[in-house]
Amino acid sequence: MSMALHSDAGFSKEDEIIGTLGIYTTNFNNGRLHAGTDRHASRDLSDILLTQLQRDIRSTFNVDWTRRSLWNRNYSETRLPAVPSTIVELLSHQNFADMRLGHDPNFKFTVGRALYKAILQYICSQHGRDYVVQPLPVSHFAIRFGQKKNTLELSWQGEEDPLEPTAKPREYIVYTRIGRGGFDNGVRVSSPSHTVKIEPGIVYSFKVTAVNRGGESFPSEILAAYKAKREKGQILIVNGFDRISGPAVIDTPDAAGFDLSQDPGVPYLYDISLCGAQQNFSRKEAGRRLGESSDEYEGMKIIGNTFDYPFVHGKAIQAAGNYSFVSCSDEAVEKGILSLEDYPIVDYILGLEKEDNSSNPARNTYYKTFSSPMQRILTSYCQSGGHLLVSGAYVGTDMDSSQGNKEFIQNILKYRHGNSLKTDGDKIAVRGLGHTFTLPRLPNEQSYPVTSPDCILPMSPAFPVMTYAIGNTPAAVAYQGSDYRTFVMGFPFESIREETSRNVIMASILRFLTTDYTD
């Protein structure tokens, strides 16, 4: 079979979705394919594809996605192939309502999976065979130190697919990376857990996939662990940076588009489709110049969320000396699979995490920095004497929406939101702890950009420990209480460009969190 995936032209001034069109050709070669099959097989293929796309998009995003039509037209891409052929005009690249979804990596995944499922169904139906769809990625991934010496216990959960009953995980593959090397070919396991023997002094990283007769899922986030040779403490790294997203949206009666200067979005791993910043936002120009952009990002492999940041934090912890660490997903903490109280220090990674309905218009996925369950867990951890490191670009902005959120960050984490840093240039300078370092501000090929990090203000008796060079506004706040300690950064730790700077900063933070200042 042959499928050409296109985007189409066309626009709606009322912000209605243009949606998907299918095209096939029957009037050629006496209505037959080269195998003698009726060319209406191409219509069947088109119908299955459009049906699956509309069903999955509507079910996942709760939007009334439009199935435009099935065209029997004379196009070379559907006329010339000697096999069942179709053109799928997925959406209109000229229409704002379509592209609000089209830029979202969650939407791209749903579309890709729907097309895959439809093709699988079509091929299997042609041959009279049952089909099985590959599983969804696993969740609730966590690593603990094992009961036996120098071992790690990995655990996770297989995911059911509410849209596809055949996509059940049957087995799993655990991939291992040693140090900065590449991942191995994996070990197949039958249950959602695995024990690994390790050598002290080496950072190990792991990712897990689910498998069945249909194939292998996308990989999990990457978690890391390290056993110090002369351990003086254990640290739990919690990965709370799950967000993938389209860019910030401008949607007013007069203007429409995407504001890369406010938030360029978070690609899944990377993005090669971006041309440049939008320049024309006038709704009056719809169908003409609305959406016109520059070209500064053409040919660039823009880095997004690599889901590999426990390793970055872990390498800095390793450099600090004699601290062991394990890591887990935030979902594992919220479900009680791991207890924060088992670790004297917790490093909570938030990256670019934030709840944002603007660039996630269907509101199907939420990326709250501190969910209600996590607020309760962190409150209990701090009140039991834990020491907490938090870093993320929206730790203030994302907690300004309700009085309850404000009270949590003010009373427990000891800071309040000031504002978001607005500046030009390709980098942001930060000073503190006897060091000056930079963060990338614009999309680039090395690390995700931190376009507008948070300025956070201390709640007494907390105090500022880092400042942004521009405006000298607080970038990080520390609290040294008799009950617990916190160190909160208004920017992501992993975005510090220089590894030497990350090592120095992490060592200083750990020293602050662990030193007994009463001596």
Regions found by a protein language model. Give the residues of each.
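Pro/Thr/Ser/Gly-rich low-complexity, intrinsically disordered linker/stalk tracts
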Residues: 122-166, 215-233
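Short beta-strand segments within Ig-like beta-sandwich modules, predominantly Fibronectin type-III
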Residues: 184-191
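Aromatic-Pro/Gly-enriched surface loop or interdomain linker
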Residues: 222-344, 349, 507-517
